[in-house]
Amino acid sequence: MPHKVSLSRLKLTDFRNYAAAALALDGRHAVLTGDNGAGKTNLMEAVSLLSPGRGLRRAAYGDITRVGAAGGFSIFAALDGMEGDVEIGTGIETGEETTARKLRINGTTAKTADELTDHLRLLWLTPAMDGLFTGASSDRRRFLDRLVLSLDPAHGRRASDFERAMRSRNKLLDEGRFDPSWLAGIEEQMASLGIAMALARQEMLGLLTRLIEETRETSPFPSASLQLSGFMDGQFSRPSVDLEDDYAAMLAESRYRDAGAGRTLEGPHRADLIVHHREKAMEAERCSTGEQKALLVGLVLAHARLVGNLTGHAPILLLDEIAAHLDEGRRAALFDLIDGLGGQAFMTGTDRAMFSALGDKAQFFTVADGRVFE
């Protein structure tokens, strides 16, 4: 069983609808119940900001600060982390117009948010993700990249560096500045970063596919088959240096076409995650809404197991409205599966009775009017 990473304290100040809130946690799962709009998902969002990025809502930091607050917002958490006990504080200060937040770990200012991954890994599933299989390919790429990040924290930096290089190339092409040596330098950088991104995605899908196959007979959820499409399909068994050379050549050959289109038409930023329901031999986008939800839950929980297996530390799960639309039997099977992962899960719902199968495996909190209490 992997080491259980768990929060013991969570304090919020001027965060969303909370002027101040504090949770004392005992390491069990945390169930947050209350009416719609009470602020349950806001608490989950606060926990999600203990990972790199903008959290489960991907909101601008200025939008997170409580309306009417004099300053910014702050989040404090104490936890038994991957390297032992740790205290994490993050937020923005009064009047800041910023795309970055301040971050302190054990009282010391962190150089980058990537340092958070030394202490915990966070995975989440929210109702906003229910349309993942039928929505835009960019949503599926973002989903896949978060899966990769949980095992390869450098993936985020590679992706942002690739985007930066691609914007530079697009700007040169848009301005008609076809300097061969300048463009070649940028395209070589894009090729190195882009192929590294694609290979990291392929590796994640391979690991996840094997684990899904191994647990297929015991999972209460349908199994997914996964593949990437839209960028150098079927070529990733070749040496990476050859792939980089080919992609750089592809970019060089497509300069005038990309200039006309106003964007780069080939690359990992155009790839798509294709998911099939294995038992039905059907594309996920053609499955019923309920089948899509079950596929997604199974996929996220399989990934959580993979993270625990490979890192030795169970991730913290944020499962928003996870029990909605499941019958009693499937809810009980879901809770058994979550508990069997060995980590701490935060779950939300409107009805406490929906979580009765958890028994004493969970702490129960009521959320109402910007307050949280047991």
Swiss-Prot record:
<dbReference type="InterPro" id="IPR003593">
    <property type="entry name" value="AAA+_ATPase"/>
</dbReference>
<keyword id="KW-0067">ATP-binding</keyword>
<keyword id="KW-0235">DNA replication</keyword>
<dbReference type="GO" id="GO:0003697">
    <property type="term" value="F:single-stranded DNA binding"/>
</dbReference>
<keyword id="KW-0963">Cytoplasm</keyword>
<dbReference type="GO" id="GO:0009432">
    <property type="term" value="P:SOS response"/>
</dbReference>
<dbReference type="InterPro" id="IPR001238">
    <property type="entry name" value="DNA-binding_RecF"/>
</dbReference>
<protein>
    <recommendedName>
        <fullName>DNA replication and repair protein RecF</fullName>
    </recommendedName>
</protein>
<comment type="similarity">
    <text>Belongs to the RecF family.</text>
</comment>
<dbReference type="GO" id="GO:0005524">
    <property type="term" value="F:ATP binding"/>
</dbReference>
<dbReference type="InterPro" id="IPR018078">
    <property type="entry name" value="DNA-binding_RecF_CS"/>
</dbReference>
<keyword id="KW-0742">SOS response</keyword>
<dbReference type="GO" id="GO:0006260">
    <property type="term" value="P:DNA replication"/>
</dbReference>
<dbReference type="InterPro" id="IPR042174">
    <property type="entry name" value="RecF_2"/>
</dbReference>
<keyword id="KW-0547">Nucleotide-binding</keyword>
<dbReference type="GO" id="GO:0006302">
    <property type="term" value="P:double-strand break repair"/>
</dbReference>
<dbReference type="GO" id="GO:0000731">
    <property type="term" value="P:DNA synthesis involved in DNA repair"/>
</dbReference>
<dbReference type="GO" id="GO:0016887">
    <property type="term" value="F:ATP hydrolysis activity"/>
</dbReference>
<dbReference type="GO" id="GO:0005737">
    <property type="term" value="C:cytoplasm"/>
</dbReference>
<dbReference type="Pfam" id="PF02463">
    <property type="entry name" value="SMC_N"/>
</dbReference>
<keyword id="KW-0234">DNA repair</keyword>
<dbReference type="InterPro" id="IPR027417">
    <property type="entry name" value="P-loop_NTPase"/>
</dbReference>
<comment type="function">
    <text>The RecF protein is involved in DNA metabolism; it is required for DNA replication and normal SOS inducibility. RecF binds preferentially to single-stranded, linear DNA. It also seems to bind ATP.</text>
</comment>
<feature type="binding site">
    <location>
        <begin position="34"/>
        <end position="41"/>
    </location>
    <ligand>
        <name>ATP</name>
    </ligand>
</feature>
<dbReference type="InterPro" id="IPR003395">
    <property type="entry name" value="RecF/RecN/SMC_N"/>
</dbReference>
<keyword id="KW-0238">DNA-binding</keyword>
<keyword id="KW-0227">DNA damage</keyword>
